[in-house]
Amino acid sequence: MAEERQDALREFVAVTGTEEDRARFFLESAGWDLQIALASFYEDGGDEDIVTISQATPSSVSRGTAPSDNRVTSFRDLIHDQDEEEEEEEGQRFYAGGSERSGQQIVGPPRKKSPNELVDDLFKGAKEHGAVAVERVTKSPGETSKPRPFAGGGYRLGAAPEEESAYVAGERRRHSGQDVHVVLKLWKTGFSLDNGDLRSYQDPSNAQFLESIRRGEVPAELRRLAHGGQVNLDMEDHRDEDFVKPKGAFKAFTGEGQKLGSTAPQVLNTSSPAQQAENEAKASSSILINEAEPTTNIQIRLADGGRLVQKFNHSHRISDIRLFIVDARPAMAATSFVLMTTFPNKELADENQTLKEANLLNAVIVQRLT
């Protein structure tokens, strides 16, 4: 054993050119393992250039000089340098000691991108797929939106007094769907759509949405809002700002009311037919339908004499029907009412039940004021 240690000591001195005491220190620290001792020496400040390490057994090493048939091994063959970009993607690397001739490399978890880097990736991906940077334009108070050109009919005036005017029909505009304009605001800790709530960058449920933006695609949830129409998406950079939810714009009351003094409350519908149709369309679009799950049609007979038919999933709850009625008839929000079945005539008291649990598939529901 003593002779092997002397051989290792002489070989360490021959390879590194250091003093014998310093060589003994590194060998003792490495348990007299020549390979580990050399690695520790160069990590401690030794030259990182190519070094010659004998691979022969200690008994075959001549005293004083390195053997002539050594195999050349570089220090970089012992510890592999990693590219900076690869380290960022794969995580930090650690080396754990093993047996005398082995070791283990441990790769840490991938480093998460900071919100600033994530926003950079989103804008970079959008620009690579055709997005154009524009200056933000803010409307002054009282400024209206761009007027739409008139597309109706009219009368062509006669050229002479005795010539009658002729009616000319206008061209009917074709609408294949509902065009939607959405503003995506990228904040310090998350993003928001228009004046909606903050959605975290780290939330797994938002990963598909952000990946679609990075690929220059319109996310599926925005395409569903358009119902086949065009989606115009604007991206605003607020990465240095904390999210502040804007105050909702004031809207004058245009709903329905009740006549006071009558024994049974009578709902008065003060909205115009166009406004009522718009409310019903908004209420219908607020019900998210999963086409992969079974669906059913529910007929609702309202207290004001109206009738609504809406598609639901079997997993929707009775409370979803109540919300649908309030959205379709905003005046009902201030009205106390219950939902009942027609036959048998029974009140649906537990509104947490699903439509399937309450046996309401393809059923007729009646609204009764209380």
Swiss-Prot record:
SUPFAM superfamilies the UniProt entry points to: NSFL1 (p97 ATPase) cofactor p47, SEP domain, UBA-like, Ubiquitin-like
Location of this chain's protein in the cell: Nucleus; Golgi apparatus, Golgi stack; Chromosome; Cytoplasm, Cytoskeleton, Microtubule organizing center, Centrosome
Keyword Transmembrane helix: no
Keywords: Chromosome, Cytoplasm, Cytoskeleton, Golgi apparatus, Lipid-binding, Nucleus, Phosphoprotein
Coiled-coil region(s): none
Residues modified as Phosphoserine: 74, 102, 114, 140, 176, 192, 272
Extent of motif Nuclear localization signal: 109-115, 172-175
Modified residues (Phosphotyrosine): 167
Described function: Reduces the ATPase activity of VCP. Necessary for the fragmentation of Golgi stacks during mitosis and for VCP-mediated reassembly of Golgi stacks after mitosis. May play a role in VCP-mediated formation of transitional endoplasmic reticulum (tER). Inhibits the activity of CTSL (in vitro). Together with UBXN2B/p37, regulates the centrosomal levels of kinase AURKA/Aurora A during mitotic progression by promoting AURKA removal from centrosomes in prophase. Also, regulates spindle orientation during mitosis.
UniProt protein name: NSFL1 cofactor p47
Organism: Mus musculus (Mouse)
